């Protein structure tokens, strides 16, 4: 289980803390969703859990072991909102072999198959893929690393309805093997497969029952549609 206890993040350049008093418990092989508007601190929390930023105070545990930056980098794999900005390989094969030069073609194919990209040519450029395919490829990159926790920052943002449904279906399959933590400003589809949920606002996190959050978002979306 992932435990976060009283975590805060207050960089010296900021007058106010970006995150304050964060508590979170996420059991293994479950999917948790954090919902909040832009600027609420949700992406910063993802960066901290991925070991890309160091929290100012508080503790992070996995299976009762407290984690530092190095352990977090090994434990967690992150898929960014715009993964295409982070692709470095000229082809899908090169992308998946970054850091794994001895990776066999069979293992590459297996990883691509796990994310529904098994029919693609390994010589295809990552930048030639659609937005949904790029997010799937970014997931395949992380699956090859074999992290314990998959972190996803706005995985459905900017995708059409069909692509969103496909991605949500994929995440439902992945949570049978991995622990997933997802942040989103609009988690309507994601809540269909979520086991637990939180709302974040002004750097403060509050746990909320999934059914209650779904009802709130339905009302909000209905009002927005009428407007």
Locations of regions flagged by a protein language model:
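Conserved H-loop
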Residues: 178-183
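ABC ATPase C-loop
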Residues: 142-143
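Conserved ABC ATPase "signature" region
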Residues: 105-121
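Helix-to-loop junction immediately C-terminal to a conserved catalytic motif
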Residues: 50
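Catalytic Walker B motif of ABC-type/P-loop ATPase nucleotide-binding domains
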Residues: 150-154
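ABC-family nucleotide-binding domains
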Residues: 160
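Conserved ABC transporter NBD signature motif
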Residues: 58-72
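Conserved ABC ATPase signature
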Residues: 125-129, 133
């Amino acid at each position: 289980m992932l435990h976060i206890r009283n975590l805060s993040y207050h960089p010296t350049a900021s007058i106010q803390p970006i995150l304050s008093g964060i508590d979170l418990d996420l059991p293994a092989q479950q999917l948790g969703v954090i919902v909040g508007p832009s600027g609420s601190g949700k992406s910063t929390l993802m960066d901290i859990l991925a070991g890309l930023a160091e929290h100012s105070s508080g503790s992070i545990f996995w299976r009762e072991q407290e984690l530092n930056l190095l352990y977090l980098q090994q434990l967690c794999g992150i898929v960014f909102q715009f993964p295409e900005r982070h692709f470095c390989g000229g082809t899908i094969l090169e992308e998946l072999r970054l850091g794994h030069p001895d990776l066999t073609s069979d293992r590459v194919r297996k990883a691509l198959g796990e994310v529904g990209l098994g029919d693609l040519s390994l010589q295809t450029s990552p930048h030639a893929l659609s937005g949904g395919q790029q997010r799937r490829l970014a997931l395949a990159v992380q699956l090859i690393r074999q992290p314990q926790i998959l972190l996803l920052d706005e995985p459905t943002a900017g995708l059409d309805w069909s692509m969103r449904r496909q991605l949500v279906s994929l995440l439902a399959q992945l949570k049978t093997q991995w622990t997933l933590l997802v942040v989103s400003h609009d988690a309507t589809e994601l809540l269909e497969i979520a086991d637990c949920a939180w709302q974040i606002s002004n750097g403060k996190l509050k746990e909320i029952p999934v059914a209650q959050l779904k009802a709130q978002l339905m009302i909000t979306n209905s009002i927005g549609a009428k407007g």
